[in-house]
Amino acid sequence: MSGAEQCANFIEAETFQTTRCDDRAAHHEGFDLVSPRDGSVRKTVDARSLFQKLVETRLATGEPYIVFSDTVNRMMPKHHRELGLKVSTSNLCAEITLPTGIDHLGNDRTAVCCLSSLNLEKWDEWNGDKQFIEDIMRFLDNVLQDYIDRAPDQMARAKYSAMRERSVGLGVMGFHSFLQAKSIGFESPMAKVWNLKMFKHISAKAEEASLVLAQERGPCPDAAETGAMERFSCKMAIAPTASISIICGGTSACIEPIPANIYTHKTLSGSFIVKNPYLQELLAKKSKDSTNVWNSILERGGSVAHLDFLTPEEKAIYKTSFEIDQRWLLEFAADRSPMIDQAQSLNLFIP
């Protein structure tokens, strides 16, 4: 696929989501492709055919990324709506949804967001610490200020945007590892309960930190202009964490299930076999932590479904991403979305 075709697919996807083509797809209704530049109708297509094309292209290439831009603008921070700001696009992974372009003061903005991710696998170690999330938000505020102070003139638009809104993105990793540590299956009501509990806690503490820092250091200019007491315009964003999850001891990435219970990690230093530590602990208890067993798991793409010495409950706990009903990922995403003021980078795993 050419770069032009990829670009066209991304534009179609954004227009498609903005005007809710998915509602019309079930009825084979006509769908207008509307230019975001001037609002003119460039073409009318069958909604179902467009949806099918998007799904097939995404399955084959991983693209286009789908962003609900109408929802993003409707749910942006209240003071940004009052200022008439608009989100036109996201970053590549689609978790950063900040205003760009000419703002209400006639200045051009380039979005800037400082990110950090909490390790949910270690939830029990930090959730009771009242200062923990506030300290992280202070750290992000300091990083943002350092960027504002030191950014070169060539980054004037980004520097201006960072100064005006001071947006940060607190995210997570290790959700599936936490569930496995607690012997909880991903496809379970208890996983749903933990998902809600964790994000309600993180969101509430991030909101508290924004107020505390606004009182201590002053609200960001965008908020101050409308009388809002917020240090950060945006506070949360669920970003992919493939690399930092490895740094954090191999915890599960982001909010997603693990792809395999054993895999080969290739680095510049060589190739290393990585095993799921919670599964290894279970196998050891059953006296099954052997090379033959692990090789059989590896041969089956990291799945334990074939191991007859595991109970159905144990197999459910160690299901891999492609074995899990993807509707659970969508349900969890919907449940946590009210607590996230930017967006979630969410992958679906379709075999």
What are the functions of these language-model segments?
Residues 1-351:
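Long, C-terminal-biased catalytic regions of enzyme "large/alpha" subunits
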